[in-house]
């Protein structure tokens, strides 16, 4: 999400929220300045009240003039018929910019917040790692967070990668160009039942150089 330095009125997430016909709650923060004028950050829009919010840097750099400075926002909310969930909205660096340390800090933070009182913990956003790449394989090796779009759209590949720990992850995902993901803590009590792409030429139209991903969940109690 971007906003000009003058403040929240120019924040892209707020502009989107203000145009929606229903009321949505917004949590947003920014990581660094892009092109020396835009506050580049992250956001969460929710139909449900926030029970808790937090934000913090997961990068070593906290210099607002450095593109390697990366902050994450976190919200906890109660979803009817499912329970409380934690959502972390992230935009991490490329491998060369510190992805590994940023992801390690993010998952440690998320794991610290996770507990039996939660139905799920989600790590969502632009991770700047291609599906099947070295960075993606690091997520798989953590054995903590799993790709929910893949679980819903390709159960066979999901099973081989996340359950059987296949050594050929890059082969299973050779045609998968995603760098944006919805990872769920594997001990969560929800399951992905459907998924689709958004913000394509056929679904709502393009809004950026990224595609959106929508995943539907049900309890698996």
How would you describe each model-predicted region?
Residues 7-8, 38-41, 100-101, 134-137, ...:
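Short aromatic-enriched loop/helix-cap "lid" or pocket-rim segments at secondary-structure transitions
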Residues 71-88, 98-137:
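His/acidic metal-ligating clusters that form di-metal
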Residues 1-86, 194-197:
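Structured beta-strand-rich core segments of catalytic domains in phosphoester-bond hydrolases
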